[in-house]
């Protein structure tokens, strides 16, 4: 998210060795609020031969109890390109361009992609999650990171543009992670990671959108149910 989604962006939080001293971690209310979000992703890497590569893209996200819906913001020309394939056979699953629906049922995340043009819901088995850039974590899908990881970070006095939101930071062996966490919305507003050598930098900016959209997963009646294996050549 396909560039890695937020879960991959902050994998370092799970593997960095020593846990730093922390201030009191934010309490997690029993029920997280419904959210409609706009998310902007940016990454920059410097290769050993001095080439800088940058990528940026945007998504929308709807969060409801037991449901998370992500959709890539696509340029108009991308839709035109898709229409150019009508009438032909498409190989593979272009999951990066399709809305992603994650459900939490019976303590287990369920993943599907939705092809609106073909009116099809494509179920992804857990054994194939890694092939479609999903790490299988419901918490990271719902909160954009695992809230417990904030306990491994130090709350700093860095100024926050959002009342009540606090910066949580950590650094290990020249690699840093920074999270601006909003305890009211229970979502990170900004996430940054990088190294002091400047070989990589990644940033995610999250903005709450006004209003609450209708749940798109409630509008899939009549869609064909397909399997991921249908798209494997």
Model features per residue range: what roles?
Residues 54-59, 97-100, 144-158, 175-176:
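Short small/polar-residue motifs
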Residues 2-67, 219-233:
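N-terminal leader/targeting segments and the immediate start of mature chains
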Residues 23-26, 31, 161-165, 171-177, ...:
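Non-transmembrane domains of secretory- and envelope-associated proteins
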Residues 50-139, 199:
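An acidic-aromatic
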Residues 38-40, 154, 205:
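Ser/Thr- (and often Asn-) enriched beta-sheet segments in non-cytosolic proteins
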Residues 39-46, 70-76, 87-91, 113, ...:
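Short beta-strand segments that buttress and anchor functional surface loops
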Residues 115, 119-166, 190-192, 215-221, ...:
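Solvent-exposed helix/loop surface patches that form functional interfaces
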Residues 100, 110, 177-178, 190:
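Conserved beta-strand and immediately adjacent loop positions that scaffold enzyme active sites
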């Amino acid at each position: 998210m396909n560039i890695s989604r937020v879960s991959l962006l902050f994998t370092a939080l799970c593997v960095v060795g020593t846990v730093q001293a922390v201030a009191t971690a934010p309490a997690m209310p029993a029920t997280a609020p419904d959210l409609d979000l706009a998310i902007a992703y940016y990454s920059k890497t410097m290769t050993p031969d001095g080439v800088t590569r940058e990528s940026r893209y945007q998504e929308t996200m709807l969060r409801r109890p037991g449901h998370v819906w992500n959709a890539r913001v696509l340029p108009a020309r991308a839709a035109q390109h898709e229409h150019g394939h009508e009438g032909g056979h498409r190989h593979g699953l272009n999951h990066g361009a399709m809305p992603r629906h994650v459900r939490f049922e019976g303590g287990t995340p369920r993943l599907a992609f939705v092809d609106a043009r073909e009116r099809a819901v494509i179920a992804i088995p857990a054994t194939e999650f890694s092939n479609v850039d999903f790490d299988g974590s419901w918490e990271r899908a719902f909160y954009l990171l695992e809230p417990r990881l904030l306990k491994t970070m130090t709350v700093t006095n860095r100024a926050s543009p959002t009342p009540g939101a606090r910066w949580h930071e950590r650094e290990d062996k020249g690699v840093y992670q920074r999270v601006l966490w909003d305890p009211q919305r229970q979502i990170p507003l900004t996430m940054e990671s990088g190294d002091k050598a400047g070989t990589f930098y990644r940033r995610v900016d999250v903005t709450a959108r006004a209003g609450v959209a209708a749940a798109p997963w409630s509008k899939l009646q009549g869609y064909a149910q397909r399997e991921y294996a249908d798209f494997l050549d």
